[in-house]
Amino acid sequence: PKFFLDIEFLILKKQIYILQVRKLNVKKSSIKNFSKPLNDLEKKILKMTKETSHLIGKERYFSTMTDWNPAEILGIKPKPLATSLYQKLITNEVWSESRLSLGYKDVTKMPLMYSFLGTPYIDLRTDINSFFISDLPENIQLKLYAFYVKKFKNAPHFYFDKIESNLVINCISLDKKKYIKILNEARLTHKEIKIILDKYTNLTKNLIFKLNENINKYNYGEYLLKKIKKSQNSSINKIFLLQNICKNYGTLPFANLARMAFVAVEFLESLESLKIISNHEKTKFLETNKSISFEMSQALRKSKLKFLQKYGHLRPNTYEILTPN
């Protein structure tokens, strides 16, 4: 095909509704004989699945759209620089440091993303482990991991890009019956269910108190960026300084805030499921939040120079920095 499309759709009463269609960044391969690289890749993955690890779970799977969904953000065949930037700024360390700082399990020595023949994949085992509570008993983690993986294998099309919202328990909202139903399906005991509910409830409460801290950190990062741009440092020095600022004051607080946003949506959904608010009220509330796209549309109506100063760095694929913007 000349190009590939990412199509998001839903099916309601046998009627298909198209939500979004976008072109995927796919680089045509110059390799004509795929036998050797595919055989080498098979050996590599088999070796990886047999490696011992301190993580819970023996079964290991990889997905292009789980969690930080690289297939959408980077494309199916991103350039090496785009892949390495994404790893440097997010999937090598930052993502796991974020989870740890919020009270989740320590998986900081484990990278989240691997590149297989140029296609980025998320390590599902590492990802699931990162949503366990840091002091959750190991026997409970084992049961949950086996349950999550079984559900993922049975319906990968349903979970591959939304495990944090549709598969793994990572917070507790107002609708506790929802989680109890899931945990009963996983065949956990009443005692184990109580432990899980208590620990994730405490984690959820603690998340709320870390909101301002991360907003302030993000804002301070913007101040540092302006300072670096005005400095007399060489371009090489600026590159390294900008990398550190982007990691510590950009993607790290962003990862924390994104996690909090997921939890906030979970609470909104629970308010609706408990019939405290209607779907219409939930939608209206969400519409009051000024999204990035809303702010961009407002900025477009003003000065072109100011718009470019704020959004001029954007391009169809953020991490393909060699692509003209």
Role assignments for model-derived ranges:
Residues 1-325:
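Conserved divalent-metal-coordinating catalytic cores
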